[in-house]
Amino acid sequence: VKLSKRWSTSLLAHYENETKAHDSNDDGFADIPRVEQYNLWNRWAYMGDRYVFQAGIKVLTEDRNSGQVSHGKTSLADPYKISIGTDRYEAFTKNAYIFNKEKNTNLALILSGSLHKQDALYGRKIYDVDQHNAYASLLFETELTKRQSLSAGLSFNYDSYDQHYRLDNDAAQPLTKKFTKEAVPGAYVQYTYNWDDKLVLMGGIRGDHSSEYGYFVTPRFHVKYNPNEYVHFRLSAGKGYRTNHVLAENNYLLASS
């Protein structure tokens, strides 16, 4: 919705309710999960002559259930159930100031944060997690010549995971508690050469420091060559790092035996 010459906003909402169990093959297990989900997304934008601003929030609430189902009036004494409850909240803001429109010289600041809470039950196995994330990025871009451009930036990423879990079916076993956190500040610089969109060369390097793993450097190089509008060649080289969170990323495997 355009509120004025410079301000606009949008609001999206979604509701899903699939709460009836289906067992078409009569194997005693639900064919698809029963899901009730709420989604809300709101964004605001300001477009000035030199200043650009965006901000938004996202909210997700979901209950997902599956497992054994009973047919008719017969009830199961101890059915196998899967239950996953999720609450997620996100917020972001993007700010950019244009110093020189002809050379596309600008400075941008991006901030975002999220809270993710999940309570999952797989039979007697349990995996509950609270994740907090904060991210900040400061970027500078400019065109050196008609065919050359340079970008550089600083970034900071923070993650924390508060996990409570039981990985076997013994309900008498206490929950294991594990808390991890990682802070990663970093910086990068990137050079781009563009010859009439036929040949594009891009080279960059960034350095980061992880509070868990120390310093590391990640270079990268990209080449794109377009001899005509139908043929395109691409070549990329580089390396990257990421921190694995095995249970958070693969807890769905707890549903298997």
How should each PLM-predicted stretch be described?
Residues 1, 36-42, 87-93, 132-138, ...:
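Hydrophobic, lipid-facing positions within transmembrane beta-strands of outer-membrane proteins
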Residues 2-7, 46-50, 97-103, 142-146, ...:
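Outer-membrane beta-barrel strand-turn architecture
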Residues 6-25, 37, 102-121, 149-159, 167, 211-217, 225, 229-257, ...:
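Surface-exposed extracellular loop regions of Gram-negative outer-membrane beta-barrel proteins
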Residues 18-39, 47-107, 113-131:
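Flexible loop and strand-edge segments within Gram-negative outer membrane beta-barrel domains
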Residues 61-65, 158-162, 242-243:
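Proline-centered turn/helix-capping motifs that create local helix->coil transitions or kinks
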Residues 68-80, 164-165, 169-175, 252-257:
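Surface-exposed loop/turn segments flanking beta-strands in extracellular/periplasmic regions
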